[in-house]
Structures are given as structure tokens and as C-alpha cells.
Amino acid sequence: VFRHARPGIAHQRVAQLLSAAWGVSVSFGVSPEAQSWVDSGWLEAPGTHEPRFEDAFAWILWRTEYWELTLEKDGHGRPMGRSAMRDVMIPEAELRAIELAEAYGVSLPLKGKPSPTVVVDIDHLFAYRGRGWRSAVGGAVRDVLRGDWRAVAERVNGPDPFYSSAYWAKWASRFPQGTLQFFVLLAVEQGTYDRGVRPDSEAVRAAIKQLGMRFEVGAHLSYGSHDRSGGFRTEIGYVDQILGVPTLRQRFHFLRNAGSLPQLQSLTELGVREDWSDEFADTPGFRSG
């Protein structure tokens, strides 16, 4: 417990981050066992200027919002990473957490090597199935007119070239030290950037349910979900219903900006606890580390 008479939302968020990093309960308050700490006051009113070193860990947490305010945006409103001051080879958040933990006697492995997590976005679960009868008929006619008999044969006899469940099952057996995290896109309405499968298709639901029996599956919200009232709720609801468990992780469509605090608050209200979509528009990596 870090001593503070009136901890606010910023203190709560930092406490949650430290708890996850250290593996122990961290909070701010005035209990008898509370420890003193160097309080620069930055957490009272977080701004866009980097705070003193003592609050550097909190700064990493807030940097997503800082860059949201300052970085140049692309045509979809996503921050451009080429102007961000960062080094993708340095795990800043981890180093700050270790350094701060040492100061308060919390033991952390200095050379811990986490197991790799491979993130798989399923934008198109199937090439042919699960897209509605109009798409199926129209696609078949197109393939016949083009003379694409291989595609016609795949439509009739399979296997579907996009359905990769068997591949990932073999991957998991070959690399048991790794973890797979899937994010499935179930767009309620088709659009320019949403041309995937239908969430009400029995074939789609069965395939996702089977995938969820072995791997972690989260929601991959569609481009159009940002523009429809209740769009997040509807698509996350489909994933909840199919898997039979609450959806705790989500990842925004790559073309949508993921740094909006109102968006994250909306997801929190829907029960989502982890956002995996902090990409820049033009460079690899995450904004906060």
C-alpha cells in the first residue's frame, strides 16, 4: 500500500498495472502499513508532459493518450509512429517495473524469459462458407464464368482454403512453449472494410466454438462497429454467445484508431478487460512500450 490520502482514477490504474507486473496486490491509501513514496503530484492531474523519473512507470501507462493528442494521424485517424520517441528493442515498462519493485523489496526475476504469444486475427474464417446464399451463388457463378475450376471444386468438395484450424493445431503441438491468441471478426453488416463471415451462420458458429475449446479466442471488432450504435455490444455479444463465456480480450480492426479513452470505457462496461490493439498506423510495435 502506497500512502495517499485521496487516490484518484490515475492512482487506481497505476495500482492495477503494478499488481499485474509484480504479482502482488498494490493499492494507494492511508492504512497503517502504507509505505511512503516520492509523490511528484503528476498522478493528481496527468498531462501531456513527461513527469519526473519517479513517475516514469505511470508515464508509460499514460503515453497512449499523450501520443493520441500529439502525433500526426493517417486517413483513418490512427497515430503515425515514425515521430514517436521510443526504442522497440527496449522493454521500457518491464525495466521500470523491476527497478521500482527492487526499491520496495519486491523480488522479480531479472532475466525472466516469457513464453511467446502468437496473435492470429481471423478476418476471414472461411473463403466460401458462412457468407450467405447470395455470396455463395454469386461467387460460384463468377468462378464458372472465369473458368476457375479449382475454386469450383473447392466450393463443392473442400477443403476451404481459408480454414486453418488444422494448421494451428499442428503448430501448437510443434511449439508447446508458445501460446496462441485468436481474435475472430464477426461483422454484423458488410462494408468496404468488412467482408468476412456472418455471425449467424451455423458453420461459422461451430468452427469458432471448436477453436475456443482448445485456444484462447477474443473479439476482433469490425471497422463498421465503431460507426453503429451498439456496434461493440452486438459483436462482442455474438462471441460471448458462441463460446459460452464472457469475452475478456478484444482487438480493434487495424484501420481504426484504438487510442480513444471513450472507446476503452465502452469496452470496460461490456466486460472486456484486455485491449490488444495499440498499433501504430505505419510502424510495428505498441504505443506503450
Task: Describe every region a protein language model picked out.
Residues 239-243, 258-289:
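C-terminal active-site subregion of NodB/CE4 polysaccharide deacetylases
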Residues 121, 220, 267:
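Conserved hydrophobic/aromatic pocket- or pore-lining residues that grip, position, or stack substrates
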Residues 25-29, 247, 274:
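Short secondary-structure junctions
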Residues 144-148, 210-211, 277-280:
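Short, surface-exposed, polar/charged, turn-prone segments marking secondary-structure boundaries
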Residues 1-199, 283-289:
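Terminal accessory/targeting
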Residues 124, 128, 149-150, 166, ...:
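Metal-dependent polysaccharide deacetylase catalytic core of the NodB/CE4 family, i.e.
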Residues 3-4, 253, 278-280:
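Conserved residues at the C-terminal ends of beta-strands
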Residues 18, 171, 238-239, 266:
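Residues within well-ordered alpha helices
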